């Protein structure tokens, strides 16, 4: 059973998350902020943490770039959910591959563990992340040899669609790739809910598209 909750801004879609997963009180979340560690703007990391804690969840932070594979494996297996924050998608993918955390995350998801991907964390579920190059700099991941990602879904999530300061660049990405890729653009108030092969995009006020 594949359970994915993909979003641009978790704090803005909390009601959608509680609809998607209601059994939250006292559960533990492996919180992976790795993508944000090479960025200057990181307010969303604390905002995501606080939103989770308000739901009664216990947050266990895990920076895969600085931990051993044994520690990463034990943490991912022990906790109930996996949450991957935003930041630089290329650096995130590089570190997941370098450490082997990518395979561990895929194993946990295959076993039914809920994965929450915010911004970069949503983008890496795509088959390949080359489409996000104009929003994120690949230069922050010099050891990354290819852009093949987790391939959990057959579409490409584009976060922050039509939101400032990404309005023009997200529109351009859609225009450039819409014919060659299966694009799923979402605003900060939308989330993509995936249960096995069922994929639904929802707006935080209850509308679907």
Swiss-Prot record:
Gene3D superfamilies: 3.40.50.880. SUPFAM superfamilies: Class I glutamine amidotransferase-like. One of its GO terms (biological process) is proteolysis. The keyword Transport does not apply. Coiled coil: none annotated. InterPro entries: Class_I_gatase-like, Peptidase_S51. One of its GO terms (molecular function) is serine-type peptidase activity. The active site is at residues 119, 160. Its EC number is 3.4.21.-. Belongs to the peptidase S51 family. This is Uncharacterized peptidase Lin0382. It comes from Listeria innocua serovar 6a (strain ATCC BAA-680 / CLIP 11262).
């Amino acid at each position: 059973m594949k359970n994915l909750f993909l979003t641009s801004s978790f704090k803005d879609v909390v009601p959608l998350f509680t609809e998607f997963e209601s059994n939250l009180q006292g559960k533990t979340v492996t919180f992976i902020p790795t993508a944000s560690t090479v960025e200057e703007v990181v307010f969303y990391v604390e905002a995501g943490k606080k939103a989770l804690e308000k739901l009664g969840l216990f947050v266990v932070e895990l920076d895969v770039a600085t931990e051993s594979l044994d520690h990463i494996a034990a943490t991912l297996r022990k906790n109930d959910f996996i949450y991957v924050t935003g930041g630089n998608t290329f650096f995130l993918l590089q570190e997941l591959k370098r450490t082997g955390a990518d395979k561990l995350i895929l194993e946990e998801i295959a076993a039914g563990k809920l994965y929450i991907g915010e911004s970069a964390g949503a983008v890496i579920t795509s088959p390949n992340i080359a489409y996000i190059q104009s929003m994120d700099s690949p230069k922050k991941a010099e050891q990354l040899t290819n852009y093949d990602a987790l391939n959990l879904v057959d579409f490409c999530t584009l976060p922050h669609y039509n939101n400032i300061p990404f309005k023009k660049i997200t529109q351009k990405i859609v225009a450039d790739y819409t014919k060659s890729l299966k694009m799923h653009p979402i605003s900060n108030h939308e989330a993509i809910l995936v249960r096995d092969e069922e994929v639904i995009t929802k707006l935080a006020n209850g509308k679907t598209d």
